[in-house]
Amino acid sequence: MPSFNPVRFLELPIDIRKEVYFHLDGNFCGAHPYPIDILYKSNDVELPGKPSYKRSKRSKKLLRYMYPVFATYLNIFEYSPQLIEKWLEYAFWLRYDCLVLDCFKVNHLYDGTLIDALEWTYLDNELRLAYFNKASMLEVWYTFKEYKKWVIDSVAFDELDLLNVSNIQFNIDNLTPQLVDKCLSILEQKDLFATIGEVQFGQDEEVGEEKDVDVSGANSDENSSPSSTIKNKKRSASKRSHSDNGNVGATHNQLTSISVIRTIRSMESMKSLRKITVRGEKLYELLINFHGFRDNPGKTISYIVKRRINEIRLSRMNQISRTGLADFTRWDNLQKLVLSRVAYIDLNSIVFPKNFKSLTMKRVSKIKWWNIEENILKELKVDKRTFKSLYIKEDDSKFTKFFNLRHTRIKELDKSEINQITYLRCQAIVWLSFRTLNHIKLQNVSEVFNNIIVPRALFDSKRVEIYRCEKISQVLVI
């Protein structure tokens, strides 16, 4: 069997390399834990036992000298000593690998959408760009100078020219409160806020221990011992485990997280910021839906920042309209909303802004579709059974890419049974719910209440996508 030739691979067209990197999904080496999804799907998680072999001198040296440097990011994987040992072996050379660097170059050309963007982090007493895989494990890291030189291919670059680097993430979920403040302080000093295109919130603000963190004195902690760093990281990990509960109550409308507050106050300086990601229902209510903002003066996202945002991603919550209405109209330029791992979504309780374009719902347990059918029944003055008799089957052979044809039937209204004016009124009722929405995607949805009714214009232009939704039996096109 011929060996792999990296030089020939790098000579391939970028489209082919892009597909290869897409399927790698950010896993560049053999040292990676099980996907996080397994923890949610299985009641029993098999943990590796203690290593039965005797560690080599090299492994002992790596653990003694290298592990303390990365302990902040590795201690959550201490359940698997073999995994950490293997990771330390890769740590020396993986960041210099030609295929890894080429992957980041292609990812940069696609604006960080191929394998996700890099994140600002603080490692070995220096601000760095890091890439975390889907299991939140650190893969590689670079200084900003290395990233521009090796990835962006600008050897003689002007350090003040940041126009071509504006898609970096700032993810407080992968940072301790102390590191959040260190990163933000250095980003401000080096005038690097313009490189941030996305901010991710996910730490739990209900845990009181974080209140005691002194933001002003956090920089004095740079030379803290590895053991104290591990303890801080473990406390941070425990906080993240609580934030998925998504409890919203009158007694819990105070924003107390130092990490979140410090980040919010720096967001106006992030001129390239276009996307916000929020994990957890309470943070969503406070930061996105603005319930309880009067109880948090100076701790909410400003109007200037809201006008810059064109994409919001929400995940890990029971429902987004628990307080009555999910109002996104304050986000004037919001164009895309992604809802992931939400237990229940009522589309009738969501209000979109006037420039809204795209809605994606994936890994959702239950969706209540717009009450379009109910309004059409009133317009036609017929009951549900009579209305169903007006359905005719659509020729769905050309939509195999967008629908599960084994389970989903595409139907339309029989125009021969109703006059043209009535049909146009039915179309108007459909568009009254969709408004400016011109793309909708459903993926891994368990159940949908109300019949799914979509506009003919969106359906014919393939802007209605349904994947892996076995419970969706039919879609009505009007």
Swiss-Prot record:
GO terms of molecular function: DNA binding, bending
Broad class of the protein's primary localization: nucleus
Biased composition (Polar residues): 217-230
Region (Disordered) location: 206-251
Compositionally biased tracts (Basic residues): 231-240
Domain of life: Eukaryota
Cited InterPro entries: LRR_dom_sf (IPR032675)
Keywords: Centromere, Chromosome, DNA-binding, Nucleus
Compartments where located: Nucleus; Chromosome, Centromere
Keyword Translocase listed: no
GO cellular component labels: CBF3 complex; kinetochore
GO BP: any one term: kinetochore assembly
Main function: Acts as a central component of the centromere DNA-binding protein complex CBF3, which is essential for chromosome segregation and movement of centromeres along microtubules. CBF3 is required for the recruitment of other kinetochore complexes to CEN DNA. It plays a role in the attachment of chromosomes to the spindle and binds selectively to a highly conserved DNA sequence called CDEIII, found in centromers and in several promoters. The association of CBF3C with CBF3D and SGT1 is required for CBF3C activation and CBF3 assembly.
Protein's recorded name: Centromere DNA-binding protein complex CBF3 subunit C
The organism's taxonomic lineage, starting at the top: Eukaryota, Fungi, Dikarya, Ascomycota, Saccharomycotina
